[in-house]
């Protein structure tokens, strides 16, 4: 059975240890890699702008509340770079299930059971839920996932709202949730199983066969169908009940003054909507944040491993910001809490400086041009963090289903 971490004190202690070690790795990398700060390269300094007085904040909050309480067409235009195919942030749409895998309660029941079953993995110890736990925002609270074998270590992204993503995984190697399920199961660095093993497990247990028969009547047990069942379940894991969503539904009091100021910062001065836009707060595209560990033991080329295009070196998919406060640590490295990420973005990140022997290296990573020093003050950063907190969903507790065993009768009673 899957062992869940829960909400106890052990998780923060473990996270602190992991993040301390991760920070040491980053510092060692930065200490041995020539860098240039963006403000230095521009010939200036990233000086924080003056903070507002309490009276000025109150006046600004009242002004913004009058603007943002209305239709989105009244909102001020966001600060967007030329060429960005931008969409306004807002409520989630309805989930569209593909024609090749229509929604059914029977498939969801089978998929949920498979999702929580560690016996699908080659070790018998890793379930999908091991890295995507409901009580941890459908992530796992770790800096990086614990793979079966050494691989580029990456943070486990939440699967909440994955139904709205066109490409899955940090490098976008899956083009559908069905592909994501199949690849997670068979990847030797993840669950490391085989289609035959999964099919054999389900075929050999009477209650699993009964669940399968309900989901796929009169069809033989296949790996493809089982992946469809898990994907069907994953498409039911959606949000849309955050305080931001309440605000969008017309509850003007759902956001505090600080959160409202943070919303305006998010769309404008902080430049967040260049990449984090649309209903899921992600453009679904790939960007280089300067965190690929170029030339180091932990180098991770990201999207390049999928496309082979040198322009994709160091690029990773923009993560959703919905539930971001519950799915820390953040970035594909899993090395940062929210405050650290905001501070890095405010500084414009750092830019690797090519050394002479790297001048013609086609695999030298190039940081996203959207990352620029912002000159935000600590008050601004606190307001931004406050707004991002409004994207948090109500805590979701889902009890794992009773897993079918050889001793069960064939009744499909495990939903």
Placement of each model-derived feature along the sequence:
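Short, Lys/Arg-rich N-terminal segment immediately upstream of the first membrane anchor
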Residues: 7-13
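Sec-dependent N-terminal signal peptides
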Residues: 16-25
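Periplasmic c-type cytochrome electron-transfer domains
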Residues: 2, 6, 17, 29-415
């Amino acid at each position: 059975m899957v062992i869940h971490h829960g909400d106890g004190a052990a998780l923060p202690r473990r996270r602190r240890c992991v993040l301390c070690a991760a920070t040491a790795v980053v510092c060692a990398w930065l200490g041995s890699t020539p860098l240039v700060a963006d403000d230095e390269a521009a010939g200036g300094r990233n000086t924080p702008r003056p903070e507002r007085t309490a009276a000025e904040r109150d006046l600004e909050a009242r002004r913004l509340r009058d603007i943002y309480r209305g239709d989105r067409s009244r909102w001020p235009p966001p600060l967007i770079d030329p060429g960005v195919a931008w969409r306004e942030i807002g409520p989630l749409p309805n989930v569209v299930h593909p024609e090749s895998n229509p929604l059914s309660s029977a498939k969801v029941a089978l998929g949920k059971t498979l999702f929580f079953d560690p016996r699908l993995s080659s070790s018998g110890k890793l379930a999908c839920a091991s890295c995507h736990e409901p009580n941890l925002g459908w992530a796992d609270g770790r800096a990086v996932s614990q793979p079966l074998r050494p691989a580029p270590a990456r943070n486990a992204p939440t699967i909440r709202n994955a139904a709205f993503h066109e490409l899955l995984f940090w490098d976008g190697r899956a083009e559908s949730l069905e592909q994501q399920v199949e690849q997670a199961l068979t990847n030797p660095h993840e669950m490391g199983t085989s289609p035959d093993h999964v099919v054999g497990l389900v075929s050999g247990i009477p209650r699993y066969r009964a669940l399968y028969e309900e989901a796929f009547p009169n069809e033989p047990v296949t790996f493809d169908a089982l992946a469809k069942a898990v994907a069907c379940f994953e498409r039911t894991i959606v949000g849309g009940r955050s305080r931001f969503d309440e605000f969008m539904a017309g509850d003007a009091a759902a956001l505090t003054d600080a959160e409202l100021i943070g919303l305006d910062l998010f769309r404008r001065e902080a430049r967040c909507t260049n990449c984090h836009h649309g209903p899921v707060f992600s453009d679904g595209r790939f960007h280089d944040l300067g965190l690929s560990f170029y030339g180091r033991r932990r180098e991770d080329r990201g999207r390049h491993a999928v496309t082979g295009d040198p322009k994709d070196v160091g690029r990773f998919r923009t993560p959703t910001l919905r539930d971001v406060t519950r799915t820390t640590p953040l970035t594909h490295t899993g090395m940062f809490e929210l405050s650290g990420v905001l501070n890095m973005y405010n500084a414009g990140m750092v830019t690797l400086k090519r050394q002479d022997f790297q001048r013609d290296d086609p695999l030298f990573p190039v940081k996203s041009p959207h990352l620029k020093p912002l000159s935000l003050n600590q008050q601004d950063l606190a307001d931004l963090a406050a707004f991002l907190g409004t994207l948090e969903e109500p805590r979701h507790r889902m009890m794992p289903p009773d897993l079918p065993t050889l001793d069960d009768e064939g009744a499909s009673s495990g939903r």
